[in-house]
């Protein structure tokens, strides 16, 4: 009986975590739209093709994505990126940056046309 209760509680805990992660991804999508990221970036067929984000969730880690959002100039130097124009450093609240990172990590592959 104890084992059933323990497993049930673990499942409930995991469901709560997944729900919180889903909420953070949804917030990330809203921040992406509100900050007008599509002016410079694209996801699928939407946005500026010069800054594609398709598959970014498999190319960069959460720490790298975070660094690009808060210190783009530093990351440009660190990675020797030659992209023009350079992404500017955004002064977003930590919660918004975390949500954007969560959303970017879901972008695993180029959407099918």
For each of these PLM feature ranges, what is it?
Residues 5-15:
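Bacterial N-terminal signal peptides
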Residues 37-40, 100:
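Hydrophobic packing within well-folded, soluble alpha/beta domains
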Residues 14-33:
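Electrostatic cytochrome c docking/interface patches
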Residues 48-57, 71-99, 104-107, 112:
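Axial heme c-ligation environment in periplasmic c-type cytochrome domains
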Residues 25-29, 39-71, 88-89:
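Gly/Gly-Pro-rich "capping" loops immediately C-terminal to redox-active cysteine motifs
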